Amino acid sequence: MVYYDLNIDSSLPEPKIKSMLSLHTKYGYDSVAITHTVEGKIGYKDVCKIKKIQIEDDSEKSTSSGWMKMGDSNKTIKQYTRLQVICKTMAEFQMITANNPVVQSYDIISVVPYDVSVFNAACNSNEIDIITIDTFSKFIIKPERVRQCIAKGIFIEILYGNLFGIDADRIAFFQIASSLVRSSFGKNIILSSSGKSSTTLRSPYDLSNLGHLFGLTFDQAKAAVSKHPHTAVLHAITRRTKGIATVTDPNLLKDLELWKLERKEDTQPTNNNIPHEKHINKESTGKETIPKPTTTTTTTTTTTTTAKTKTPTPTPTTEKTPSIPTQPPQKPTAKSNKKTTTNTTSTAQKQGKMDIDIDNNKRKRE
């Protein structure tokens, strides 16, 4: 288990900071944040100037259990830099942007709101990691804003160092802590010392018992000094590092790579410059021609012919001279079905008249 204390005042003398780091190591803390506090608008004079403190005493070794006893672990305490801005107006809060070089020079960014409008804006901000609730924050904390803060991944810090001050600060601490626990159900709560005196520092197990006094369970109070601060540090790293990361199933990745290879084979040219036979004109070799589309038109014509027949006229003769019978007219050849159906009745009548005339001529000759 890794324990954190994310609030140690950087304005203290260096020997005192070094003694406090040694005490943190004895209590089992693994990481701390040295905080630079700015009241009002931040400027170029507030660029990070915090240097890493070297602990020379080798006898001060950290404990893995969090109790105040000497251990055999040789791990050194990790130090982060933190900027804490006390904002009373929205103009001061709007100075905290990702493009500000002062903000970029620190590892962790936190805000101490003294106005409800600043607190509401901080709960919906992407530029900060921690909201510190101080006893000077004289406003009502709404549960909706706290849940919005949790959804954004922002953590709310409570400074337990106010318990060792005057009675008014102690009462204000329990009121604020109880309302935050009721609103957040114990989520995204961080417990930190004020970092101004070694007498106010407590071990992680003492803070776990302290959490019971304002509504936290043992696991939630333990997470307030281990899991939640660790997540806040990761949130700060992701805020500073802008990029895109994808997580895929290995089996799905194999299928995707195979699909890319197949797609590459389909789209890669084959360096074949010889055209296909259907695109080559046989008469003119070497020239590629596009076959022209052929259209066929069918026309149907119907012709109608009228059969002209000469009716025989009798010639008056005094002598009996044989008359040459007229040949019957040839039947017209109908080229269409309509002609054959319309002329069948007329030809039959004309043929009957011609037969009667021939019989009359034979009788006259006799």
Swiss-Prot record:
tRNA processing recorded as keyword: yes
Biased composition (Basic and acidic residues): 275-290, 352-366
Region (Disordered): 265-366
Catalytic reaction annotation: Endonucleolytic cleavage of RNA, removing 5'-extranucleotides from tRNA precursor
Enzyme Commission number: 3.1.26.5
Catalytic EC class: hydrolase
Record-linked Pfam families: RNase_P_p30 (PF01876)
GO MF assignments: ribonuclease P activity; ribonuclease P RNA binding; RNA binding; tRNA binding
Disulfide cross-links: none
Source organism, top-level taxon: Eukaryota
Biased composition (Low complexity): 291-324, 333-351
Nucleotidyltransferase in keyword set: no
Keywords assigned: Hydrolase, Nucleus, tRNA processing
Gene3D superfamilies documented for this protein: Metal-dependent hydrolases (3.20.20.140)
GO-annotated cellular components: nucleolar ribonuclease P complex; ribonuclease MRP complex
UniProt subcellular location: Nucleus
GO biological process, one term: rRNA processing
Family from the record: Belongs to the eukaryotic/archaeal RNase P protein component 3 family.
Main function: Component of ribonuclease P, a protein complex that generates mature tRNA molecules by cleaving their 5'-ends.
Protein name: Ribonuclease P protein subunit drpp30
Organism field: Dictyostelium discoideum (Social amoeba)
Name of the gene encoding the protein in the UniProt record: drpp30
